[in-house]
């Protein structure tokens, strides 16, 4: 069917699946990883799926092992990434009678899955070879159209463990055929949603490239195979319209995308470019983590166009858009013939709009370079600015949810778009941050993870995945003594001591000692000047490494506010001197 990577968790009831996976791995038909923590295993597989656009699989035994798959299933559902969850189960005769390790696991994952495939109640051995092939084919298609998690719950009757000779006989006779049936019709995710506000399958909504507008590119939620066509369609639309492109670091747009504006989040936060002129809005994918953007979009009212890459659920929390779910490439194919001879980008109003954004962006980037030099104490804004510059071109980056992804949105420079960036912007959790990054590194090669201390500690079992595969992952740990994101969310309803206890929750754990306990090479960086050498050291290692930097979350929170206010005054001064018309 196309399965290339499987993560196996320990268990007895799943013994037949383990033996089959081992046999396929020995004949190089499958890449096999092992993990003792099912939650970590599922995120490892999800990382591989996210990197390749093709589903990886997880195998678990019965019982609570299945419940641990739910966080990854939720993230796969919301980020639209394929994932196969194979769980062994007891036969039906052992259900609801107090049998050991027997629960109603067939229902555990259903809210987050594209499809639940239930094997024969008395045991998978009752499936014929043809039925099993059809069952597997359907699961594979459901995991990819539209992409998400599929759960196969597979009862096994004893005996569970065959001899090696019996296993060989099975493997010799196993020769899966190319899928015979026509593709399964994709399910409509919106049918299961609580509402379909603004979602349409009618003729796609048309924008007018002869009038000014703006493109808002959120996180990419399509499959890897569709990315180039998406990028090319946007390039052609921008060449026609001349609109500025406000892109999220997770948008998967290249650094040479015409009209790309890097500092848009900070510029919107100043309020100087948030004019009330009526602009058309083309939104691609989900909303970025920016309240300034939300407020700005609200000022334009309804009639905005939101295009998703196959996700038919409503993705507009603002309720202002018409939503087209069949992808930018499909939308562009519907409309490009209308404007073959148009020269919309030469329209004076559009040219003035793009020029204002580009000049403001250039001044903002130059000002940030002055404010965030590569020297002195380490701050989170400075890390976001410099890490991408110091890394090899095209090296992928995984950004933990909460502070890192927001800082890179605001402070990273244009070099960020020379590489793919990943993050949890589906369900926006911190589950599995390290484990998913391990999966990315296994699939893509050298990769960098930027994580806070709580996110890394929450998934510390991910360090167990370092051996024996040794994925080339450099982990930059921002240790600010707790949940730094809450300093930014203006939680001021509690005194300082209560804030630390109820929100920040600092942990008394030495992350370097924890890494050392897992035989992970580690290093502490004391100042920004030492960062280049530390990154060079980390990338030179053969497997995962930890680079720890310590920051002060309260001071960094104040610094972010000072940067926003300072940029506003800087741009106002430039405008008064006639260098830019705001």
UniProtKB/Swiss-Prot annotation:
Catalyzes the thiamine diphosphate-dependent decarboxylation of 2-oxoglutarate and the subsequent addition of the resulting succinic semialdehyde-thiamine pyrophosphate anion to isochorismate to yield 2-succinyl-5-enolpyruvyl-6-hydroxy-3-cyclohexene-1-carboxylate (SEPHCHC). Homodimer. Binds 1 thiamine pyrophosphate per subunit. Keywords: Magnesium, Manganese, Metal-binding, Thiamine pyrophosphate, Transferase. InterPro entries: MenaQ_synth_MenD, THDP-binding, Thiamin_PyroP_enz_TPP-bd_dom, TPP_enzyme_TPP-bd. This is 2-succinyl-5-enolpyruvyl-6-hydroxy-3-cyclohexene-1-carboxylate synthase. Belongs to the TPP enzyme family. MenD subfamily. It comes from the Bacteria. Its EC number is 2.2.1.9.
């Amino acid at each position: 069917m196309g399965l290339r990577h499987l993560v196996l968790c320990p268990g007895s009831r799943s013994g037949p699946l383990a033996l089959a996976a081992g046999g396929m791995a020995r004949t190089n038909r499958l890449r096999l990883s092992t993990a003792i923590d099912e939650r970590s295993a599922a995120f490892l597989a999800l990382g591989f799926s996210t990197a390749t656009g093709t589903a990886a699989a997880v195998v678990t035994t019965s019982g609570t092992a299945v419940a641990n798959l739910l966080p990854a299933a939720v993230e796969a559902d919301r980020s639209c990434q394929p994932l196969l969850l194979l769980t062994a189960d007891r036969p039906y005769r052992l259900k609801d009678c107090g049998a050991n390790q027997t629960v109603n696991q067939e229902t555990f994952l259903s809210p987050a899955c594209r499809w639940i495939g239930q094997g024969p109640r008395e045991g998978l051995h009752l499936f014929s070879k043809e039925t099993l092939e059809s069952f597997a084919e359907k699961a594979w298609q459901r995991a990819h159209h539209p992409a998400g998690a599929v759960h196969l719950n597979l009862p096994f009757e004893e005996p569970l463990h065959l001899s090696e000779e019996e296993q060989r006989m099975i493997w010799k006779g196993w020769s899966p055929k190319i899928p015979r049936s026509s593709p399964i019709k994709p399910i409509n995710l919106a049918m299961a949603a609580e509402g379909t506000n603004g979602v349409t399958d009618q003729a796609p909504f048309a924008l007018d490239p002869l009038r000014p507008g703006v493109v808002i590119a959120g996180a990419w939620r399509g499959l890897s195979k569709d990315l180039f066509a998406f990028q090319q369609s946007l390039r052609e639309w921008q060449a026609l319209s001349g609109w500025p492109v406000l892109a999220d670091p997770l948008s998967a747009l290249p650094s040479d995308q015409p009209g790309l504006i890097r500092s848009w989040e900070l510029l919107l936060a100043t309020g100087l470019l948030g004019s009330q002129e009526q602009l058309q809005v083309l939104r691609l994918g989900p909303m970025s983590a920016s309240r300034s953007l939300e407020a700005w979009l609200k000022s334009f009212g309804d009639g905005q166009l939101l295009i998703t890459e196959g996700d038919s659920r409503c993705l507009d929390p603002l309720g202002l858009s018409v939503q087209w779910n069949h992808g930018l490439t499909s939308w562009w194919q519907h409309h490009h013939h209308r404007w073959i001879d148009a020269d919309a980008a030469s329209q004076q109003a559009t040219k003035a709009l793009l020029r204002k954004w580009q000049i403001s962006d250039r001044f903002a980037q130059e000002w940030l370079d002055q404010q965030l030099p590569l020297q002195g104490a380490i701050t989170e804004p400075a890390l976001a600015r410099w890490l991408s510059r110091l890394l090899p071109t095209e090296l992928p980056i995984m950004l933990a949810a909460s502070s890192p992804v927001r800082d890179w949105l605001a402070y990273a420079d244009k070099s960020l778009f020379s590489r793919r960036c990943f993050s949890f912007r589906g369900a926006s959790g911190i589950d599995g941050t390290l484990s998913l990054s391990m999966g990315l590194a296994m699939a893509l090669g050298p990769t960098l993870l930027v994580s806070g201390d709580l996110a890394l500690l929450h998934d510390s079992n991910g360090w167990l995945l370092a051996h024996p595969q040794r994925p080339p992952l450099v982990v930059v740990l921002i240790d600010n003594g707790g949940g730094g994101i809450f300093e930014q969310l203006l939680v001021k309803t509690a005194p300082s001591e209560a804030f630390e206890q109820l929100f920040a929750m600092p942990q008394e754990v030495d992350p370097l000692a924890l890494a050392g306990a897992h035989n992970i090479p580690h290093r502490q960086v004391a100042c920004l000047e030492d960062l280049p050498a530390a990154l060079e050291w980390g990338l030179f290692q053969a497997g995962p490494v930890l680079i720890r930097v310590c920051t002060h979350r309260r001071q960094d929170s104040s610094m972010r506010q000072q940067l926003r206010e300072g940029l506003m005054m800087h741009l106002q001064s430039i405008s008064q001197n006639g260098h830019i018309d705001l």
